[in-house]
Amino acid sequence: MPTISQLVRKGREKLVVKGKSPALKESPQKRGVCTRVYTTTPKKPNSALRKVARVRLTNGIEVTSYIPGVGHNLQEHSVVMIRGGRVKDLPGVRYHIVRGTLDSVGVAGRKQSRSKYGAKRPS
């Protein structure tokens, strides 16, 4: 426990809060190019083949991001937009690809939560 004079001289060190999506550098979204599109298996109680992509962002950082929705058209060299938001059962996946922007098409036949998957209104 420091004395009062020690606190006057040095003060307390501020705790540094680490962000959840550091690669975005305080931006809401970032553009990037897919370097690899593949599937991964999730953590223990779950079982599936989750679609993910390695994306090199415009600021030079390479991140792993999740491709949401059923089916996608992404391949290597596709230009995509990423946003923050982790996938709980995929370790190291802290970003989502935004569907319906740039080279990523929206989910076909989607009727509910359309705005989250870039689907147009059914006519």
UniProtKB/Swiss-Prot annotation:
Gene: rpsL
Pfam family, one: Ribosom_S12_S23
Similarity section: Belongs to the universal ribosomal protein uS12 family.
Subunit record text: Part of the 30S ribosomal subunit. Contacts proteins S8 and S17. May interact with IF1 in the 30S initiation complex.
GO biological process: translation
Function of the protein: With S4 and S5 plays an important role in translational accuracy.
Keyword list, A-Z: Methylation, Ribonucleoprotein, Ribosomal protein, RNA-binding, rRNA-binding, tRNA-binding
Post-translational modification 3-methylthioaspartic acid, affected residues: 89
PROSITE patterns noted in UniProt: RIBOSOMAL_S12 (PS00055)
Recorded GO CC terms: small ribosomal subunit
Organism this protein belongs to: Myxococcus xanthus (strain DK1622)
Origin: domain of life: Bacteria
Transmembrane segments annotated in the record for this chain: none
InterPro entries for this protein: NA-bd_OB-fold, Ribosomal_uS12, Ribosomal_uS12_bac
Database matches in Gene3D superfamilies: Nucleic acid-binding proteins (2.40.50.140)
Protein name: Small ribosomal subunit protein uS12
One annotated GO molecular function: tRNA binding
